[in-house]
Amino acid sequence: MVNEARGNDSLNPCLEGSASSSSESSKDSSRCSTPGLDPERHERLRDKMRRRMESGDKWFSLEFFPPRTAEGAVNLISRFDRMAAGGPLFIDVTWHPAGDPGSDKETSSMMIASTAVNYCGLETILHMTCCCQRLEEITGHLHKAKQLGLKNIMALRGDPIGDQWEEEEGGFNYAVDLVKHIRSEFGDYFDLCVAGYPKGHPEAGSFEADLKHLKEKVSAGADFIITQLFFEADTFFRFVKACTDMGITCPIVPGIFPIQGYHSLRQLVKQSKLEVPQEIKDVIEPIKDNDAAIRNYGIELAVSLCHELLASGLVPGLHFYTLNREMATTEVLKRLGMWTEDPRRPLPWALSAHPKRREEDVRPIFWASRPKSYIYRTQEWDEFPNGRWGNSSSPAFGELKDYYLFYLKSKSPRELLLKMWGEELTSEESVFEVFVLYLSGEPNRNGHKVTCLPWNDEPLAAETSLLKEELLRVNRQGILTINSQPNINGKPSSDPVVGWGPSGGYVFQKAYLEFFTSRETAEALLQVLKKYELRVNYHLVNVKGENITNAPELQPNAVTWGIFPGREIIQPTVVDPISFMFWKDEAFALWIEQWGKLYEEESPSRTIIQYIHDNYFLVNLVDNDFPLDNCLWQVVEDALELLNRPTQNEREMEAP
């Protein structure tokens, strides 16, 4: 791809097919020594715990289990994203031997934990059991976990298949064997957690014997302990004292189970072989068929237990057994004052917790609303841009062949998407209306609100409210916006709408607008843009690869940056012309993959979406004069006015 000569307002391609998806080499990133904006990104889990304990800052963590279905996997990842907002220190994912836990299936323990780390940015512990497995299998699972970016393992024996425990020849028989093997094979790479049983393991000969086994696990290399659930604070206090007397000094985190239903309580008690206190039974039995009443009681009980634990000074944090539900646990945490939705962001985009991405601090703006897709397409990179985007000539983005990978799939089912986007489209204007309703928040003619688009699976970003009226006006006229940001000139980094990074800094943005529009509008835009050559950078491309840009030598353009005390300037978001050509493949494909395929082939609705896909252009505009008023709206308005201006023949026909 080369620059189109300035002043040429035709849509002849500069170079067709100039960028194609490839993953043959890693991104040539120009690394620098820019200090990390978020210290926790660079810390091991055990170090995060230690720092929190030294400061007295209590934490919470959450346990989940793998779902049984692909749809359940999509829902669980959505739940991860929602519950991440409260600020858990980590989550853990259980190991289900019956569910092929180490496989690449979307319902496997390995894939769910990997997704939490890579695509949800969550510090994650993967449970791993050693019963009924050969040494080679266990070692293979651990190597795979390391490759996927998992750095924390909860080492467990696991439950036997059937009622009787049988030793595995050539395998491990106890959790301590697994701990020793991990330390022997992987050194200090993994942080290791082990289980503690406040009333003793049901298969142990005695409470004292079980404590001895726990001490062996810690001595073998375990970093911290998470306990089985319990119902009374004194049970935990006695356990901690016994551990201390035994010489166990690592953190001991209590496991909390908010009772959420009669049947789930019975099932969990059966599995854990715990006895429910009589006073709890007396309350639950009369209301066992009233789930809401039991849940409310469970919340009250959990809050009371947690208050008692926290007041003791013996508890560094709380670990919640969620049963893959969010309401009860979230409510308990809110009542405890531990659920903290901090609007501050380390960077303007969603982070990944994969160790090799710890230094990453620059991304193209195009994937702002599809961060999981960006992470997927760059997963094979060996290094990630740090300090600046670097050499733009050789980014290698992997192909997005499968739009239905569970962590990239829309959170909304097909039936709901049809209700939002239209069970029947009658014209291009029907599509315009969907974009307008997404921005306005108004229900459509069938009473359904449009809460997502193929390019935006989340509600509108807070900063979009600063542009809402202008966006509504242009979308009504066929400027179908999928990404935008206002110009910002030195707002505090603590600003709740546009702020990011450490406190005490200032953030800046160039105005940015990205949209689909018709060829006719694109041609009018090019004529108008002649007047803005030195101020506005533009790039127009269609699905065939025809493109026109005035980007100087195809260099990346920093559109977001921040200045912070004692640090170099951070520029986390760029408009990169080369990356835009990779993004356009994905952006155009979403018309068909997520919208068009909702309709039958050859149907009028499918034909309309196909026409837009085949004929519209994807455009991005950058206003480089960020201290001045945003000129992009005037550019678009002038283009629309030019487009709607009567031709010479029309004027002659209208003349008297």
From Swiss-Prot:
Q: Which residues bind substrate?
A: D159, Q228, Y321, R325
Q: What is known of its domains?
A: Contains a serine-rich phosphorylation region at the N-terminal and an eukaryote-only S-adenosylmethionine (SAM)-binding domain at the C-terminal. Through asymmetric homodimerization, the two regions are positioned next to each other and N-terminal phosphorylation increases sensitivity to SAM binding and inhibition.
Return the protein name.
Answer: Methylenetetrahydrofolate reductase (NADPH)
Q: Which GO terms describe its molecular function?
A: FAD binding; methylenetetrahydrofolate reductase (NAD(P)H) activity; methylenetetrahydrofolate reductase (NADPH) activity
* Pathway where this protein functions: One-carbon metabolism; tetrahydrofolate interconversion
Q: What is its EC number?
A: 1.5.1.53
Mind telling me how this protein is modified after translation? Phosphorylation of an N-terminal serine-rich phosphorylation region increases sensitivity to S-adenosylmethionine and inhibition.
Q: Which reaction does it catalyse?
A: (6S)-5-methyl-5,6,7,8-tetrahydrofolate + NADP(+) = (6R)-5,10-methylene-5,6,7,8-tetrahydrofolate + NADPH + H(+)
The residues the record assigns to binding NAD(+) are E63, F64, F65, P66, P67, R68, T94, W95
Instruction: Report residue spans for region: Disordered.
Output: 1-46
Top enzyme category: oxidoreductase
- The entry marks the following residues as binding FAD, namely 94-95, 127, 157-159, 174-175, 197, 201-204, 210, 217
Q: What does this protein do?
A: Catalyzes the conversion of 5,10-methylenetetrahydrofolate to 5-methyltetrahydrofolate, a cosubstrate for homocysteine remethylation to methionine. Represents a key regulatory connection between the folate and methionine cycles.
Query: How the protein assembles, per its UniProt entry?
Result: Homodimer.
Q: Which Pfam families does the protein's record reference?
A: MTHFR, MTHFR_C
Q: Does the keyword Flavoprotein apply?
A: yes
Q: Would you identify the family this protein belongs to, as annotated?
A: Belongs to the methylenetetrahydrofolate reductase family.
List the InterPro entries hit by this protein, alphabetically. FAD-linked_oxidoreductase-like, Fadh2_euk, Mehydrof_redctse-like, MTHFR_C
Q: Using the record's annotations, give every residue carrying the modification Phosphothreonine.
A: T34, T94, T451
